[in-house]
Regions:
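Conserved catalytic or regulatory cores that recognize and/or transform ribose-phosphate-containing ligands
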Residues: 1-176
Length: 176
């Protein structure tokens, strides 16, 4: 039977060292959709450069990604671990630019910093310093969390995702 569903686009924004967390985000979103799509009529679609972009010319890479899908997202989840990312014309990394676009648009950003152990071969001093400076920039704004394990991240993210989108659903219903 056909059903009306409100679709939210969730941007996954992270440097290339974040791989396991992308899988965990996808799993958390799948779990959310399984629980709430039929009962509440809301669903979330994840958007990530690896699956939501296409080859395009005629502009700067990050600007093209922003136009293709970033600007169309309703919320974002951003994660940092050992790398800050590739600089853009405007920001220290594409991830930083995506976060700023979302925040300037008044959209929800779930921001996380990994405190998982780092193998010595993955340590990038310059990248780590940039991450710490970025983290310090937001420390008084209360918009990020840290985690020390994959399981902790998945539980925390699922809880935050659920609280936000269930609140969105309640607010939209009371506005009717």
């Amino acid at each position: 039977m056909a059903q009306n569903v409100t679709l939210y686009n969730l941007l996954i924004s992270c440097p290339g060292d974040i791989k396991k967390e992308v899988t965990l985000i996808e799993a958390a979103v799948d779990e959310f959709n399984e629980l709430y799509t039929e009962t509440l009529g809301i669903t979330i679609k994840t958007r990530h450069w690896s699956k939501s972009s296409y080859a395009q010319s005629g502009g700067k890479p990050q600007a093209l990604l922003n136009e293709q899908f970033v600007n169309k997202c309703d919320a974002a989840v951003a994660i940092f671990w050992t790398r800050f990312g590739t600089p853009t014309d405007e920001y220290g990394s594409g991830t930083e630019e995506e976060i700023e676009i979302m925040l300037q648009s008044g959209k929800q950003v779930f921001m996380y910093f990994s405190d998982k152990p780092i193998p010595p071969s993955k340590i990038n001093g310059d990248g780590y310093e940039k991450i710490q400076a970025f983290r310090d920039k937001y420390k008084d704004k209360g918009i990020y969390f840290t985690y020390s394990s994959d399981e902790e991240f998945k539980k925390m993210f699922f809880a935050h995702l659920s609280m936000h989108f269930l609140t969105e659903k309640r607010v939209s219903e009371t506005a009717k």
